């Protein structure tokens, strides 16, 4: 998805929010909704990373407590021309990961213990590179904004349904139209949020593959994580499904294929896209970029920068 289309979708979310506000309080309600949207996004801008990391019980690690992971993130961040993000570990058996933070200078990468135990070093590099791609694309802020506005639309619509719309003049939509809008607006907001999330995943897959130098490392990791996500529950994510879009693979049980209600593209489609990228880049041959010494290898030259 182009950034222009993303901007259009964000504008649509804001318009939905103002529309619900209008149905409740007329023009004044629309303006109040706009102010509320700005205020909630400002709060999310400064606090969302701490909130989500705390929600998942993530604890920060460093070169002393998790040297291999920390060194891998540092090397990949340097390769991506990014500041070193903070690194967090979640005590969770489901292999998964996400990135958060308002900008690259205040970003964090969080991985589960299940991910560390399930993946080979090359696959872990692919996952970390994918999360760094989200940071590089400023997707962490984008998804925070969309989730915040979508949540506010649902909350405001519920408020309107409980108290009834206040804009019922002759030129208004009437009570039936108001109720329909208040029911459909949250659904529309969710669809827009999911559309943005799904397409940003494709962009992060491509950039992540270029950062680590081997698209198939990420493809292999996605297959393993997706298989495990169907079998290993993520209880924290089940309690907070609004955060599911943050993860590299949908952490919720029962997630389906590539459809309007999916938080992520289907894993099969993502792997196919990475396979096409591998064919275009000729990644079956050694990566043309200089290969830095990786955290797990013994210095022997292998395919790609870490394997």
Curated annotation (Swiss-Prot):
Binds 1 zinc ion per subunit. One of its GO terms (molecular function) is zinc ion binding. GO terms for cellular component: plasma membrane. InterPro entries: HtpX_protease, Pept_M48_protease_HtpX, Peptidase_M48. It is found in: Cell inner membrane. Coiled coil: none annotated. It is a multi-pass membrane protein. NCBIfam families: PRK01345.1, PRK03001.1. This is Protease HtpX homolog. It comes from Nitrobacter hamburgensis (strain DSM 10229 / NCIMB 13809 / X14).
């Amino acid at each position: 998805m182009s950034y222009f289309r993303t901007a259009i979708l964000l504008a649509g979310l804001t318009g939905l929010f103002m529309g619900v506000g209008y149905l409740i309080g007329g023009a004044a309600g629309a303006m109040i909704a706009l102010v509320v949207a700005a205020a909630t996004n400002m709060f999310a801008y400064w606090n969302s990373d701490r909130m989500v990391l705390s929600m998942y019980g993530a604890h920060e690690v460093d070169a002393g407590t998790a040297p291999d992971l920390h060194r891998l993130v540092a090397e990949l961040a340097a390769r991506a021309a990014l500041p070193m993000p903070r690194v967090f570990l979640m005590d969770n058996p489901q292999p998964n990961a996400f990135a958060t933070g308002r900008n690259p200078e205040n970003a964090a990468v969080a991985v589960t213990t299940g991910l560390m135990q399930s993946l080979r070093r090359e696959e872990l590099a692919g996952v970390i590179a994918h999360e760094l791609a989200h940071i590089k694309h400023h997707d962490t802020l984008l998804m925070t904004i969309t989730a915040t506005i979508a949540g506010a639309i649902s909350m405001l619509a519920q408020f309107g349904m409980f108290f009834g719309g206040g804009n019922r003049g002759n030129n208004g939509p009437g009570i039936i139209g108001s109720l329909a809008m208040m029911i459909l607006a949250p659904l529309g907001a969710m669809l827009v949020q999911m559309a943005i999330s799904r397409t940003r995943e494709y962009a992060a897959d491509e950039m992540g593959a270029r950062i680590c130098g081997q698209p198939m490392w990420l493809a292999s990791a996605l297959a393993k994580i997706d298989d495990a996500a169907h079998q290993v529950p993520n209880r924290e994510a089940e309690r907070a499904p609004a955060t599911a879009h943050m993860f590299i693979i949908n952490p919720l049980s029962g997630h389906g294929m590539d459809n309007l209600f999916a938080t992520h593209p289907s894993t099969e489609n993502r792997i196919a896209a990475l396979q096409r990228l591998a064919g275009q880049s000729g990644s079956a041959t050694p990566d043309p970029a200089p290969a830095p010494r990786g955290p797990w290898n013994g210095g022997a030259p292998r395919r790609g920068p870490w394997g």
